[in-house]
Amino acid sequence: LESNTDFEQYTVQITQNSVEKNMEEFFRLMALSSDDKGAFLTVQNKEFFVDLALRFSATDQYKLFFMEIEGAKVAACICFSYEGTYLLYNSGYDPEKSSLSVGLLNKALTIQEAIRLDVKEYNFLRGTERYKYHLGASDRAVFDLVVSR
């Protein structure tokens, strides 16, 4: 990618003034990347994402990464930063740029940033998507615990 095109990966600051514009761009990429993600993006779920962005940005725990190629946003992902761990929450990319593996590279560059910042763990959270294993993930047991009286 570096040798073939002009690209940039960066984190955006989420504020009350910037949240709508940045999250709409994230939602666009998320919806483009799969029909399931597009269907998931109801008004209620979008409002939830915006609320998360504002709440966790206030404590610098929310990271919204965008990748641009020639000035156009082509991939994005959200990570939470918590107690020395980056937690990959959700992502999206433009499938027209899939030949450049922009979705995978967007995530790989967040791992690179985590290493640069001396983050101790990068957690892909639930799911067995193939890209997670391409980036070095290993399975962990995840348990649901229900406590009742």
What are these regions (language model features)?
Residues 1-99:
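A conserved beta-strand-loop-helix scaffold within acyl/acetyltransferase catalytic domains
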Residues 10, 111, 148-149:
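Short, basic, helix/turn surface patches
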Residues 98-112:
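Conserved acetyl-CoA-binding loop-helix of GNAT-fold acetyltransferases
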